[in-house]
């Protein structure tokens, strides 16, 4: 069984047992959460597609940790003008493990 969920403007295909990095949520490690924005649920060849969401479907997950991703370096430069600008960014994330899919 698998599901397609939406979180933070991105879509993820998940199955039970998957580890996933989602946008940061203010939750402690070990906390349970239910992701109810389920776009699609599939069992073998039987697929249920929502319009836009599947009614009554939810994905259960457990928070594993909070963290920050690797740094993304931004470098701007104008040729021949000696203009250079550097910037960096580290995105916060919440790592979760999928524990169940209800459809």
From Swiss-Prot:
Q: Which GO terms describe its molecular function?
A: rRNA binding; structural constituent of ribosome
**Alphabetically ordered keywords of this record:** Ribonucleoprotein, Ribosomal protein, RNA-binding, rRNA-binding
Segments forming a coiled coil = none
Q: Which GO terms describe its cellular component?
A: cytoplasm; ribonucleoprotein complex; ribosome
Indicate whether ATP-binding appears among the record's keywords: no
Which InterPro entries does the annotation name? bL21-like, bL21-like_sf, Ribosomal_bL21, Ribosomal_bL21_CS
Which SUPFAM superfamilies does the record match to this protein? L21p-like (SSF141091)
Q: Report the superkingdom from the record.
A: Bacteria
So where does this one cross the membrane? none
Query: What Gene Ontology terms for biological process does this UniProt record contain?
Result: translation
Q: Which family does it belong to?
A: Belongs to the bacterial ribosomal protein bL21 family.
Its assembly, as annotated, is: Part of the 50S ribosomal subunit. Contacts protein L20.
**Purpose:** This protein binds to 23S rRNA in the presence of protein L20.
Entry protein name: Large ribosomal subunit protein bL21
Give the species this sequence originates from.
Answer: Acidithiobacillus ferrooxidans (strain ATCC 23270 / DSM 14882 / CIP 104768 / NCIMB 8455) (Ferrobacillus ferrooxidans (strain ATCC 23270))
